[in-house]
């Protein structure tokens, strides 16, 4: 693992890490913030270990990080899926239910997420980012990830299935 020499460019397109399949090496964006580093590292490590699905790599990162004895690493695991949870909840819940869920999140976590988004948006180029999104969506679909870039958020289905499996296993 190493930081990318192309950090400014990959920050412009919103990429935090990448896996180079030809050299079996992954790189991390040098602009990563401390709470993002562990989850991004384990996500890319999952790809190195052979997991191609972005949802499964997110699930792997979540599982590894949230089981750590280090509280910063655990936090990274939880924080890494917050956006996916909220995006899915907004689509599935009524406005009242969503507001209740959002209100249950500690204010300092919401503030950190807001600052995180501002940090990355200041580096992001919409034109270059849109082109990269389109190309990457085609790349994923060409590699049998039918949902393309939407696959990242499919981690929520994996988490729900895992929690249901755990409940059944503990009966």
Q: Can you describe what each PLM-predicted range is?
A:
Residues 21-23, 33-37:
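Extracytoplasmic
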